[in-house]
Protein backbone atom coordinates (compact mmCIF):
# COMPACT_ATOMS: atom_id res chain seq x y z
CA UNK A 1 0.00 0.00 0.00
CA UNK A 2 1.30 3.44 -0.97
CA UNK A 3 1.47 6.30 1.49
CA UNK A 4 1.38 9.98 0.57
CA UNK A 5 1.27 13.40 2.18
CA UNK A 6 -1.05 16.22 1.10
CA UNK A 7 1.36 19.07 1.73
CA UNK A 8 0.28 22.45 3.18
CA UNK A 9 0.63 24.73 0.18
CA UNK A 10 -2.01 26.95 1.83
CA UNK A 11 -1.89 28.50 5.28
CA UNK A 12 -3.07 26.40 8.22
CA UNK A 13 -3.31 23.16 6.26
CA UNK A 14 -6.77 21.58 6.33
CA UNK A 15 -8.19 22.79 9.64
CA UNK A 16 -10.54 25.77 9.39
CA UNK A 17 -10.03 26.76 13.00
CA UNK A 18 -8.46 29.52 15.05
CA UNK A 19 -7.35 26.95 17.64
CA UNK A 20 -5.29 24.75 15.32
CA UNK A 21 -1.62 25.47 14.49
CA UNK A 22 -1.45 28.76 12.57
CA UNK A 23 1.26 29.11 9.93
CA UNK A 24 1.97 30.49 6.47
CA UNK A 25 3.11 28.32 3.56
CA UNK A 26 6.76 28.59 2.54
CA UNK A 27 9.12 26.57 0.41
CA UNK A 28 11.23 25.78 3.47
CA UNK A 29 8.24 24.40 5.38
CA UNK A 30 7.15 22.19 2.50
CA UNK A 31 10.73 21.09 1.81
CA UNK A 32 11.08 19.97 5.41
CA UNK A 33 7.80 18.05 5.29
CA UNK A 34 8.50 16.31 1.98
CA UNK A 35 12.09 15.46 2.85
CA UNK A 36 10.99 13.92 6.14
CA UNK A 37 8.19 12.04 4.37
CA UNK A 38 10.78 10.70 1.95
CA UNK A 39 13.01 9.76 4.89
CA UNK A 40 10.17 7.69 6.37
CA UNK A 41 9.45 5.93 3.09
CA UNK A 42 6.35 7.77 1.88
CA UNK A 43 5.76 7.06 -1.80
CA UNK A 44 4.29 10.41 -2.89
CA UNK A 45 3.48 14.01 -2.05
CA UNK A 46 0.68 16.08 -3.59
CA UNK A 47 0.24 19.84 -3.67
CA UNK A 48 -3.16 21.33 -4.41
CA UNK A 49 -3.83 24.58 -6.27
CA UNK A 50 -5.99 27.17 -4.56
CA UNK A 51 -6.34 30.69 -5.94
CA UNK A 52 -8.54 32.40 -3.37
CA UNK A 53 -8.94 31.83 0.34
CA UNK A 54 -11.97 31.69 2.59
CA UNK A 55 -11.18 34.68 4.82
CA UNK A 56 -12.50 34.64 8.37
CA UNK A 57 -10.50 35.27 11.52
CA UNK A 58 -7.95 32.65 10.50
CA UNK A 59 -7.62 34.09 6.97
CA UNK A 60 -8.01 30.50 5.87
CA UNK A 61 -6.15 29.74 2.62
CA UNK A 62 -5.70 33.46 1.94
CA UNK A 63 -2.00 32.63 1.58
CA UNK A 64 -1.12 30.04 -1.06
CA UNK A 65 1.92 29.05 -3.06
CA UNK A 66 1.72 27.92 -6.70
CA UNK A 67 1.73 24.18 -7.27
CA UNK A 68 4.03 23.55 -10.27
CA UNK A 69 6.79 25.93 -9.26
CA UNK A 70 6.72 24.54 -5.71
CA UNK A 71 7.01 20.96 -6.94
CA UNK A 72 9.81 21.87 -9.35
CA UNK A 73 11.77 23.18 -6.38
CA UNK A 74 10.98 20.10 -4.32
CA UNK A 75 12.01 17.84 -7.20
CA UNK A 76 15.51 19.29 -6.98
CA UNK A 77 15.89 18.56 -3.25
CA UNK A 78 14.43 15.03 -3.12
CA UNK A 79 15.52 11.76 -4.69
CA UNK A 80 12.89 9.02 -4.32
CA UNK A 81 9.46 10.39 -3.50
CA UNK A 82 6.90 10.90 -6.30
CA UNK A 83 5.61 14.46 -6.67
CA UNK A 84 2.19 15.49 -7.97
CA UNK A 85 1.36 19.10 -8.86
CA UNK A 86 -2.18 20.31 -9.52
CA UNK A 87 -3.36 22.16 -12.60
CA UNK A 88 -6.52 24.24 -12.46
CA UNK A 89 -7.58 23.61 -16.03
CA UNK A 90 -9.22 27.02 -16.50
CA UNK A 91 -5.97 28.85 -15.78
CA UNK A 92 -3.22 27.26 -17.89
CA UNK A 93 -3.34 25.93 -21.49
CA UNK A 94 -2.73 22.18 -21.74
CA UNK A 95 0.21 22.58 -24.14
CA UNK A 96 1.99 24.80 -21.62
CA UNK A 97 1.29 22.40 -18.75
CA UNK A 98 2.53 19.49 -20.87
CA UNK A 99 5.84 21.31 -21.32
CA UNK A 100 6.03 22.28 -17.65
CA UNK A 101 5.47 18.65 -16.69
CA UNK A 102 8.16 17.49 -19.11
CA UNK A 103 10.57 19.92 -17.49
CA UNK A 104 9.83 18.67 -13.96
CA UNK A 105 10.07 15.10 -15.23
CA UNK A 106 13.63 15.96 -16.24
CA UNK A 107 14.42 17.64 -12.91
CA UNK A 108 13.02 14.75 -10.88
CA UNK A 109 14.24 11.84 -12.96
CA UNK A 110 10.75 10.52 -13.61
CA UNK A 111 9.06 11.26 -10.27
CA UNK A 112 6.39 13.68 -11.46
CA UNK A 113 2.67 13.53 -12.15
CA UNK A 114 -0.30 15.88 -12.54
CA UNK A 115 -3.53 16.20 -10.57
CA UNK A 116 -6.40 17.47 -12.74
CA UNK A 117 -8.54 20.12 -11.03
CA UNK A 118 -11.70 20.90 -12.98
CA UNK A 119 -12.71 23.61 -10.50
CA UNK A 120 -15.73 24.04 -8.22
CA UNK A 121 -15.08 27.42 -6.51
CA UNK A 122 -16.31 30.09 -8.92
CA UNK A 123 -14.67 33.00 -7.08
CA UNK A 124 -11.18 31.63 -7.72
CA UNK A 125 -11.56 32.14 -11.44
CA UNK A 126 -14.03 35.01 -11.60
CA UNK A 127 -11.55 37.33 -9.84
CA UNK A 128 -9.17 36.92 -12.80
CA UNK A 129 -11.75 37.07 -15.55
CA UNK A 130 -11.34 33.35 -16.26
CA UNK A 131 -14.77 32.05 -15.26
CA UNK A 132 -16.57 30.98 -18.46
CA UNK A 133 -20.05 31.18 -16.94
CA UNK A 134 -22.06 28.96 -14.63
CA UNK A 135 -22.84 26.52 -17.42
CA UNK A 136 -19.20 25.42 -16.97
CA UNK A 137 -20.36 23.39 -13.96
CA UNK A 138 -22.15 21.13 -16.43
CA UNK A 139 -19.27 20.60 -18.85
CA UNK A 140 -16.16 20.85 -16.67
CA UNK A 141 -15.31 17.17 -17.06
CA UNK A 142 -15.77 17.33 -20.83
CA UNK A 143 -13.39 20.30 -20.77
CA UNK A 144 -10.93 18.36 -18.60
CA UNK A 145 -11.17 15.38 -20.94
CA UNK A 146 -9.98 17.42 -23.92
CA UNK A 147 -7.31 19.01 -21.72
CA UNK A 148 -5.82 15.63 -20.84
CA UNK A 149 -6.12 14.37 -24.41
CA UNK A 150 -4.04 17.30 -25.67
CA UNK A 151 -1.33 16.74 -23.05
CA UNK A 152 -1.13 13.01 -23.64
CA UNK A 153 -0.86 13.45 -27.40
CA UNK A 154 2.00 15.92 -26.97
CA UNK A 155 3.80 13.65 -24.52
CA UNK A 156 3.35 10.70 -26.85
CA UNK A 157 4.21 12.25 -30.22
CA UNK A 158 5.58 15.75 -29.62
CA UNK A 159 2.95 17.28 -31.89
CA UNK A 160 -0.80 17.86 -31.96
CA UNK A 161 -3.48 18.94 -34.40
CA UNK A 162 -6.22 18.18 -31.87
CA UNK A 163 -9.57 19.69 -32.79
CA UNK A 164 -12.13 19.58 -30.02
CA UNK A 165 -14.97 21.71 -28.73
CA UNK A 166 -12.81 23.52 -26.18
CA UNK A 167 -9.26 23.18 -27.51
CA UNK A 168 -7.86 23.44 -31.01
CA UNK A 169 -4.20 22.76 -31.76
CA UNK A 170 -2.66 23.78 -35.08
CA UNK A 171 0.63 22.02 -35.76
CA UNK A 172 1.47 22.42 -32.07
CA UNK A 173 4.96 21.14 -31.27
CA UNK A 174 6.46 20.13 -27.93
CA UNK A 175 9.96 18.69 -27.65
CA UNK A 176 11.73 17.11 -25.91
CA UNK A 177 9.31 14.36 -25.05
CA UNK A 178 9.21 13.34 -21.39
CA UNK A 179 11.68 10.57 -20.64
CA UNK A 180 9.22 8.85 -18.30
CA UNK A 181 5.49 8.35 -18.04
CA UNK A 182 3.77 11.33 -16.45
CA UNK A 183 0.97 9.88 -14.36
CA UNK A 184 -2.43 11.56 -14.12
CA UNK A 185 -4.45 11.65 -10.92
CA UNK A 186 -7.97 12.95 -10.36
CA UNK A 187 -10.32 13.42 -7.43
CA UNK A 188 -13.72 12.52 -8.83
CA UNK A 189 -16.37 11.84 -6.18
CA UNK A 190 -19.48 12.15 -8.39
CA UNK A 191 -20.40 9.53 -11.02
CA UNK A 192 -19.15 11.86 -13.78
CA UNK A 193 -15.91 12.46 -11.93
CA UNK A 194 -15.42 8.74 -11.36
CA UNK A 195 -15.99 8.04 -15.06
CA UNK A 196 -13.37 10.65 -15.96
CA UNK A 197 -10.87 9.11 -13.56
CA UNK A 198 -11.58 5.60 -14.80
CA UNK A 199 -10.84 6.70 -18.36
CA UNK A 200 -7.85 9.00 -17.97
CA UNK A 201 -6.30 8.76 -14.49
CA UNK A 202 -3.83 6.35 -12.97
CA UNK A 203 -5.23 7.00 -9.48
CA UNK A 204 -8.32 8.68 -8.08
CA UNK A 205 -8.33 10.47 -4.75
CA UNK A 206 -11.29 9.49 -2.60
CA UNK A 207 -12.58 11.39 0.42
CA UNK A 208 -12.91 9.21 3.47
CA UNK A 209 -15.47 10.44 6.01
CA UNK A 210 -16.33 10.50 9.68
CA UNK A 211 -14.17 10.33 12.80
CA UNK A 212 -12.48 6.97 13.43
CA UNK A 213 -14.63 5.29 10.78
CA UNK A 214 -11.78 3.95 8.64
CA UNK A 215 -13.85 1.89 6.21
CA UNK A 216 -16.47 4.52 5.39
CA UNK A 217 -15.01 4.93 1.89
CA UNK A 218 -16.06 1.42 0.89
CA UNK A 219 -18.98 2.65 -1.25
CA UNK A 220 -16.85 5.21 -3.08
CA UNK A 221 -14.26 2.53 -3.77
CA UNK A 222 -17.00 0.28 -5.12
CA UNK A 223 -18.21 3.06 -7.40
CA UNK A 224 -14.68 3.56 -8.70
CA UNK A 225 -14.24 -0.18 -9.26
CA UNK A 226 -17.53 -0.25 -11.19
CA UNK A 227 -16.38 2.68 -13.34
CA UNK A 228 -13.02 1.03 -13.97
CA UNK A 229 -14.73 -2.22 -14.97
CA UNK A 230 -16.29 -0.32 -17.89
CA UNK A 231 -12.94 1.01 -19.13
CA UNK A 232 -10.79 -2.03 -18.40
CA UNK A 233 -8.06 0.10 -16.86
CA UNK A 234 -6.15 -0.24 -13.59
CA UNK A 235 -7.12 2.79 -11.51
CA UNK A 236 -6.78 2.54 -7.76
CA UNK A 237 -8.11 4.71 -4.97
CA UNK A 238 -5.87 6.96 -2.92
CA UNK A 239 -7.95 7.68 0.19
CA UNK A 240 -7.60 10.97 2.07
CA UNK A 241 -7.41 11.06 5.88
CA UNK A 242 -6.43 13.60 8.51
CA UNK A 243 -4.32 12.17 11.32
CA UNK A 244 -4.41 13.65 14.82
CA UNK A 245 -2.20 11.48 17.00
CA UNK A 246 -0.76 11.69 20.48
CA UNK A 247 0.58 9.38 23.16
CA UNK A 248 -2.93 8.55 24.41
CA UNK A 249 -6.42 8.49 22.93
CA UNK A 250 -7.51 11.09 25.46
CA UNK A 251 -4.76 13.55 24.55
CA UNK A 252 -5.50 13.23 20.84
CA UNK A 253 -9.24 13.66 21.38
CA UNK A 254 -8.60 16.75 23.50
CA UNK A 255 -6.74 18.34 20.58
CA UNK A 256 -9.54 17.47 18.17
CA UNK A 257 -12.13 18.98 20.53
CA UNK A 258 -10.09 22.16 20.86
CA UNK A 259 -9.91 22.51 17.08
CA UNK A 260 -13.67 22.07 16.84
CA UNK A 261 -14.26 24.64 19.56
CA UNK A 262 -12.19 27.12 17.56
CA UNK A 263 -13.98 26.56 14.24
CA UNK A 264 -13.71 29.65 12.03
CA UNK A 265 -17.41 30.06 11.26
CA UNK A 266 -16.94 33.03 8.93
CA UNK A 267 -14.57 31.05 6.71
CA UNK A 268 -17.05 28.15 6.62
CA UNK A 269 -19.80 30.52 5.50
CA UNK A 270 -17.68 31.58 2.52
CA UNK A 271 -16.91 27.97 1.62
CA UNK A 272 -20.57 27.01 1.84
CA UNK A 273 -21.54 29.89 -0.43
CA UNK A 274 -19.04 28.78 -3.07
CA UNK A 275 -20.14 25.17 -2.78
CA UNK A 276 -23.76 26.14 -3.44
CA UNK A 277 -23.06 27.78 -6.81
CA UNK A 278 -23.33 24.54 -8.77
CA UNK A 279 -27.06 23.85 -8.63
CA UNK A 280 -26.67 20.60 -10.57
CA UNK A 281 -23.91 19.06 -8.41
CA UNK A 282 -24.44 15.47 -7.33
CA UNK A 283 -24.77 14.83 -3.63
CA UNK A 284 -21.45 12.98 -3.68
CA UNK A 285 -19.59 15.80 -5.44
CA UNK A 286 -16.62 17.45 -3.77
CA UNK A 287 -18.43 20.78 -3.41
CA UNK A 288 -21.35 19.16 -1.59
CA UNK A 289 -19.34 16.70 0.50
CA UNK A 290 -16.87 19.16 2.01
CA UNK A 291 -19.70 21.43 3.16
CA UNK A 292 -21.68 18.86 5.13
CA UNK A 293 -22.30 20.40 8.56
CA UNK A 294 -21.05 17.44 10.60
CA UNK A 295 -17.36 18.14 10.08
CA UNK A 296 -16.90 21.08 7.75
CA UNK A 297 -13.96 22.46 9.75
CA UNK A 298 -11.71 19.94 7.98
CA UNK A 299 -13.70 19.53 4.77
CA UNK A 300 -15.48 16.44 6.10
CA UNK A 301 -12.43 14.35 5.31
CA UNK A 302 -11.98 11.10 7.17
CA UNK A 303 -10.32 11.88 10.49
CA UNK A 304 -8.29 9.42 12.53
CA UNK A 305 -7.88 10.56 16.14
CA UNK A 306 -6.10 8.59 18.83
CA UNK A 307 -2.95 7.16 20.29
CA UNK A 308 -0.19 5.98 17.99
CA UNK A 309 -1.43 2.41 18.33
CA UNK A 310 -5.04 3.40 17.67
CA UNK A 311 -4.09 5.39 14.58
CA UNK A 312 -2.00 2.51 13.22
CA UNK A 313 -4.82 0.02 13.74
CA UNK A 314 -7.44 2.23 12.11
CA UNK A 315 -5.26 3.06 9.11
CA UNK A 316 -4.63 -0.65 8.60
CA UNK A 317 -8.40 -1.11 8.50
CA UNK A 318 -8.67 1.68 5.92
CA UNK A 319 -6.01 0.04 3.77
CA UNK A 320 -7.90 -3.26 3.82
CA UNK A 321 -10.90 -1.89 1.89
CA UNK A 322 -10.93 -3.43 -1.62
CA UNK A 323 -9.73 -1.03 -4.29
CA UNK A 324 -7.52 0.98 -1.92
CA UNK A 325 -4.05 1.40 -3.43
CA UNK A 326 -2.87 4.00 -0.99
CA UNK A 327 -3.63 6.51 1.74
CA UNK A 328 -2.93 10.23 1.51
CA UNK A 329 -2.50 11.93 4.87
CA UNK A 330 -2.83 15.41 6.27
CA UNK A 331 -1.86 16.32 9.82
CA UNK A 332 -3.01 18.90 12.32
CA UNK A 333 0.63 19.85 12.83
CA UNK A 334 2.59 18.74 9.76
CA UNK A 335 6.13 19.03 11.10
CA UNK A 336 5.43 17.20 14.34
CA UNK A 337 2.87 14.96 12.68
CA UNK A 338 5.29 13.54 10.11
CA UNK A 339 7.85 12.80 12.82
CA UNK A 340 5.35 11.17 15.17
CA UNK A 341 3.88 9.15 12.33
CA UNK A 342 7.24 7.97 11.06
CA UNK A 343 8.60 7.10 14.48
CA UNK A 344 5.56 5.79 16.34
CA UNK A 345 2.66 4.98 13.99
CA UNK A 346 4.07 3.53 10.79
CA UNK A 347 6.20 0.87 12.55
CA UNK A 348 2.95 -0.54 14.01
CA UNK A 349 1.12 -0.73 10.66
CA UNK A 350 0.93 -4.19 9.13
CA UNK A 351 -0.11 -2.67 5.80
CA UNK A 352 3.26 -0.88 5.63
CA UNK A 353 5.48 -3.72 6.80
CA UNK A 354 6.69 -4.58 3.30
CA UNK A 355 7.42 -0.93 2.44
CA UNK A 356 9.30 0.23 5.51
CA UNK A 357 12.72 1.65 4.76
CA UNK A 358 15.51 1.86 7.34
CA UNK A 359 16.07 5.34 8.68
CA UNK A 360 18.83 7.12 6.76
Curated annotation (Swiss-Prot):
Gene3D superfamilies assigned to the protein according to its UniProt record, in alphabetical order: Luciferase-like domain
InterPro entries for this protein: Luciferase-like_dom, Luciferase-like_sf, Pyrimidine_monooxygenase_RutA, SsuD_RutA_monooxygenase
Keyword set, alphabetical order: Flavoprotein, FMN, Monooxygenase, NADP, Oxidoreductase
Source species: Bradyrhizobium sp. (strain BTAi1 / ATCC BAA-1182)
Its job: The FMN-N(5)-oxide reacts spontaneously with NADH to produce FMN. Requires the flavin reductase RutF to regenerate FMN in vivo.
A Pfam family annotated for this UniProt entry: Bac_luciferase
EC numbers on record: 1.14.99.46
Protein name (record): Pyrimidine monooxygenase RutA
Name of the top EC class for this enzyme: oxidoreductase
Organism lineage: Bacteria, Pseudomonadati, Pseudomonadota, Alphaproteobacteria, Hyphomicrobiales
Amino acid sequence: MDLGVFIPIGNNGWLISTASPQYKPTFELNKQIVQRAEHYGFEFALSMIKLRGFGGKSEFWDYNLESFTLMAGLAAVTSRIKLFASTAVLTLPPAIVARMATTIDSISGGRFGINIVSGWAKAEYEQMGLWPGDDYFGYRYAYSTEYVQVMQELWRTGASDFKGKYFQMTDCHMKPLPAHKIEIVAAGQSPTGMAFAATYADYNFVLASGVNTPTAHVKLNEQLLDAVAKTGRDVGAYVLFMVIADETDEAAMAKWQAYKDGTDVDALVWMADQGSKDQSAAGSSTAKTINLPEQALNFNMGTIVGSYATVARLLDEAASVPGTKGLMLTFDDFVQGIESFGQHVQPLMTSRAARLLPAA
